[in-house]
Amino acid sequence: CGLCHSVQGTELKMIEGGFPNADVKKGESLEFYHSVCPVFYYKDEKKHDIWGNIKKALIGYSSDKKIRFKAASGGALTEISCYLLENKKVDAIIHTTYDPNDPTKTISCISTTVEEVISRCGSRYGISVPLKDILQMVQSNKKYAFVGKPCDVMALRRYLNKDEKLTKSIIYLLYYLFDLFSSVFR
């Protein structure tokens, strides 16, 4: 997710398969990683035989057909993001989009309008590290919603317990289940 890079400056090195991995130096304290990284705390969650580690799962989709068919997995998170902006619950949405310099890559972005959210929505079939620059993206006088993968949200939620200032800025955490049921909503 890149949170260790944003908070601690940990270098992210590409490993086999093209995935970024924290390059933890020999002798470096693992306290931060153990307290925030999903790799270390998944074991504490209840595990369902089919779904894995869950607390609650809901199914839904956007009532706006334009969003439902353009966005990923029925557009529920895009619709919620638009609602949060339209109703001034947040100033911006932190999420991912394709890299305009290389559409095969994913980058983090901040959307402040419904139009931006909709233009940047859709499935990303590539690696993303949406928390890599989270501290640099957030302005303390603004309110945000963050949209990411379940592991990104888990890491960010645990970090927010340590950072009161960031907790006041990122007030909604939203995640999705990897296009699991998109054909049901079409």
What residue spans do the PLM features occupy?
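Iron-sulfur cluster-binding cysteine motifs and their immediate structural context
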Residues: 3-23, 30-50
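Iron-sulfur-associated redox domains of electron-transfer enzymes in respiratory
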Residues: 38-186
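Short, flexible, glycine/charge-rich loop motifs used to bind or transfer phosphoryl groups or to couple energy/partner
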Residues: 24-27, 134
